[in-house]
Design a protein with these regions (language model features):
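Helix-helix packing/entry segments at the starts of transmembrane helices
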Residues: 92-98, 163-181, 211-246
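C-terminal transmembrane-helix exit sites in multi-pass transporters
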Residues: 80-82, 99-121, 133, 238-258
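Glycine-/small-residue-enriched transmembrane alpha-helix faces in small-molecule transporters
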Residues: 1-32, 71, 79, 138-165, ...
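Loop-to-transmembrane-helix transition segments
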Residues: 1-5, 54-79, 144-152, 187, ...
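C-terminal-most transmembrane helix of multi-pass membrane proteins
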Residues: 36, 135, 234, 238-284
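Hydrophobic/small/kink-forming positions within alpha-helical transmembrane segments
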Residues: 10, 14, 44, 70, ...
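Transmembrane alpha-helices of multi-pass small-molecule transport proteins
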Residues: 23-75, 102, 155-159, 175-191, ...
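Hydrophobic transmembrane alpha-helices of multi-pass small-molecule transport proteins
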Residues: 43, 73, 115-135, 154-156, ...
């Protein structure tokens, strides 16, 4: 399920770049509006197909906790778009892939949840990798995009930590709220919400991709341990960067390759270790 979701999500970054580059009148806010709006509509449609007459109740039941999670989700949706626009796709995806580490940090701050020594070591190594990636952007606008990517990872940390706190909430409708929040903010900031007809297909594809992939990612931890989900998620960084290289000829910098390798390998090994520890505890 998670692998399928990640594979579907992989072209997302390239679609953002293709839409944003289509016309000088289309700015990042325009892209964000359509991304958020179609995400909200797509997820709401999935909720309706499952719950039918209970759809409105499902949205009402998310409560204040769901709205708070939706807020952080909406902010991360926005910062992700700006990250992709202002820095290389490889840089953005590598930095955003540190989400699991950000979750551990936010959980420590908000929930006073203690992390193991292995996790703290992983954090240090990951931040070294991020430093290497971002050091290659110093002096250019790419550094702005790198910071947006870092904010996205932090917002993801808040989103998933609060998801664990409010674990009884149905998170699929919350995804729709996040998209709606992003769209509402963007509509007031965009120069125009009109888009060239040649990118309509890209926009629709973006909405479908987000709706399906994030809905699957949201429910995946119900069927497999979170650590195992974490082992799969870095796959998006690799696939997304390769797709960008192939379609828009954007080659990763040496800093991105070195720093990205450090980050991805560390995240994979940490998730692998966590999975093994969880399996050992189950056998006791």
């Amino acid at each position: 399920m998670t692998i399928f979701a990640v594979v579907i999500l992989s072209p997302d970054s390239v679609l953002i770049r293709l839409v944003e580059d289509a016309s000088p009148d289309v700015d990042s806010w325009t892209v964000l509006f359509w991304r958020g709006a179609l995400y909200a509509v797509g997820v709401s449609t999935l909720v309706f197909l499952k719950y039918r007459s209970k759809t409105i109740s499902e949205f009402k039941n998310i409560g204040k906790g769901g709205l708070l999670i939706g807020f952080f989700s909406g902010i991360s949706t926005g910062t992700f778009v700006f990250a992709i626009v202002y820095t290389s796709i490889a840089n953005a995806l590598v930095i955003i892939s540190t989400g699991p580490i950000m979750i551990a940090i936010v959980a420590w701050v908000l929930l006073r949840e203690k992390s193991s020594l292995v996790t703290w070591i992983a954090m240090v190594i990951v931040f070294i990798g991020i430093y290497i990636v971002m050091s290659g952007s110093v002096g250019g606008k790419s550094l702005v995009g790198d910071f947006f990517a870092l904010i996205t990872a932090v917002m993801m940390g808040f989103t998933f930590t609060l998801t664990r706190k409010y674990k009884d909430i149905n998170m699929v409708p919350v995804n729709a709220i996040g998209g709606l929040i992003a769209a509402v903010i963007a509509v007031f900031m965009a120069n125009t919400i009109a888009i060239p007809k040649e990118v309509v297909t890209y926009i629709i594809a973006m909405g479908v991709i987000l709706s399906i992939s994030f809905s699957l990612i949201t429910i995946a931890p119900r069927y497999m341990p979170a650590a195992e989900v974490g082992m799969i998620m870095p796959l998006e960084t690799v696939l997304g960067s390769l797709i960008a290289w192939y379609i828009i000829k954007e080659e990763p910098t040496m800093n991105a390759l070195i720093g990205g390798s450090i980050v991805i390998v560390t995240l994979f090994l940490h998730s692998w270790y966590s999975t093994n520890q969880a399996h050992k505890l189950e056998k006791i």
